[in-house]
Amino acid sequence: MKVRIAVVGKLDGFIKEGIKHYEKFLRRFCKLEVLEIKRVHRGSIEEIVRKETEDLANRILLGSFVMVMDRRGEEVSSEEFADFLKDLEMKGKDITILIGGPHGLNEEIFAKAHRVFSLSKMTFTHGMTVLIVLEQIFRAFKIIHGENYHY
């Protein structure tokens, strides 16, 4: 299974270290790819969001299950997320996870999404969202394989 996370914005050094940490743990479960999508700085907020969303959409893996992370999405437990991931794994599906920048995402991307998830009603930076998503993916695979995930 391939998991691609496309995120708007440059990721800080400590976030990149966290990504390396989870890449090491996830290596035996999936092939992970994290793509930084350049932020747009010119134009109205609406134009910026449209362009950033378009750039994200262009990074969707062909034939993959598309997940969007958005505070308006569905909140699920770690066990429910593990069941969801197991189902995709059994179907042989790759996953593309899209994370917007500070101004959010254009509504058009939600039409491309198969599912929209929320980590919380709180708002997180795009970098922290990446790390939390990676932790939940790792936790889900540990649950799927019946391994202890409290480390």
Curated annotation (Swiss-Prot):
One of its GO terms (molecular function) is rRNA (pseudouridine-N3-)-methyltransferase activity. Keywords: Cytoplasm, Methyltransferase, rRNA processing, S-adenosyl-L-methionine, Transferase. Its main location: cytoplasm. It is found in: Cytoplasm. Its EC number is 2.1.1.177. Gene3D superfamilies: 3.40.1280.10. It comes from the Bacteria. GO terms for cellular component: cytoplasm. It is an enzyme of class 2 (transferase). It catalyses: pseudouridine(1915) in 23S rRNA + S-adenosyl-L-methionine = N(3)-methylpseudouridine(1915) in 23S rRNA + S-adenosyl-L-homocysteine + H(+). Signal peptide: none annotated. S-adenosyl-L-methionine binds at G100, L119, S120, K121, M122, T123, F124. Specifically methylates the pseudouridine at position 1915 (m3Psi1915) in 23S rRNA. Belongs to the RNA methyltransferase RlmH family. Homodimer. This is Ribosomal RNA large subunit methyltransferase H. The gene is rlmH.
